[in-house]
Amino acid sequence: MSTLFIADLHLSVQEPAITAGFLHFIQREAIHADALYILGDLFESWIGDDDPEPLYRQVAAALKSLQQQGVPCYFIHGNRDFLLGKRFAEESGMVLLPEENVVELYGRKILILHGDTLCTDDTDYQHFRKKVHNPLIQKLFLWIPLRLRLRIAAYMRNKSQQNNSGKSERIMDVNSKAVIDAFLRHDVSWMIHGHTHRPAIHSVELPMVTAHRVVLGAWHVEGSMVKVTADNVELITFPF
């Protein structure tokens, strides 16, 4: 018995090898799991559930097949696909979770999240995040014609890449205090997240206990998953 976690696949039509790797992962690994959790940035971008891109239908069909075979799939939004909504969730069979969620697995309480909210030193990003998560702004954006949304999304991606190229590695990583606060706020000793693309298992000293923060890797040249069983929590890389 095991539960699997993945994040930061950044699926797009420009990277067919990653999509193929994800579909193989569904057929080879996820099908045998108790559940699959996707912790954000499944897609490189998401401009609305009404986007007819065939890639999205392909991914939805694979996830729906997984659900129909008895493996539930849960999703937490990332900074790239935060507009993914109920329509796609229903099409794919995924259950949408809040941005911070505690799951109990095999005797462990684990906090799961995308991870961008932990990067509090990146104040420019946090200000931007607050704006784009405003329900009114999201509603207005989704009201814009699809073709214009595509152009806006492309512009924002380019701008983000330019901004990040000038930021220090420290600023774009998690803030230690934010991590400790999250552990204490949810009263857990395990955390799994993505976003930073820095796969590792970190020990975090809390009052009376040593906690563990597990960071998923991005799917660039290989896959990354966390496998939780009754006996262990493993961070695993694998070829596509």
Swiss-Prot record:
Extract one GO BP annotation from the record. lipid A biosynthetic process
CDD domains in UniProt: MPP_YbbF-LpxH
Q: Which reaction does it catalyse?
A: UDP-2-N,3-O-bis[(3R)-3-hydroxytetradecanoyl]-alpha-D-glucosamine + H2O = 2-N,3-O-bis[(3R)-3-hydroxytetradecanoyl]-alpha-D-glucosaminyl 1-phosphate + UMP + 2 H(+)
What does the record note about the cofactor? Answer: Binds 2 Mn(2+) ions per subunit in a binuclear metal center.
Residue sites binding substrate per the record: N79, R80, D122, S160, N164, K167, H195
| Pathway(s) this gene product operates in, as recorded in its UniProt entry | Glycolipid biosynthesis; lipid IV(A) biosynthesis; lipid IV(A) from (3R)-3-hydroxytetradecanoyl-[acyl-carrier-protein] and UDP-N-acetyl-alpha-D-glucosamine: step 4/6
The UniProt function text for this chain reads:
Hydrolyzes the pyrophosphate bond of UDP-2,3-diacylglucosamine to yield 2,3-diacylglucosamine 1-phosphate (lipid X) and UMP by catalyzing the attack of water at the alpha-P atom. Involved in the biosynthesis of lipid A, a phosphorylated glycolipid that anchors the lipopolysaccharide to the outer membrane of the cell.
- Name of the molecule in the record: UDP-2,3-diacylglucosamine hydrolase
